[in-house]
Amino acid sequence: MNYRYRAVEPFWKHFHRLNDAQKESARQTWKIFRENPFDPRLRTHKIHKLSSLYGETIYAVDIEGDLRSTFYVDGNWIVSVDIGTHDIYKG
């Protein structure tokens, strides 16, 4: 499917707080993500706690180490919600 992409404010706020190496890892992951958000290399997985909290199926992709990015699918849109450590799963 051809998705369109956007990010909401928590994502950008937290992205700008990452160090340069983390930002570069996120950019490299983004290249794969743009091709296929469910590519096995990303280890995309549902975050059930956030999904029930927000009423949307929330997914996370692994970027590096403990760094994750969360998103949901809205029709043909992929909406990036947040980026950070496992703490972002707390909602």
Model-identified regions with their sequence ranges:
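Enriched for short, Lys/Arg-rich terminal
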Residues: 2-4, 10-20, 54-56, 60-91
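Generic structural signal for secondary-structure transition and capping sites
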Residues: 20-23, 35-38, 68
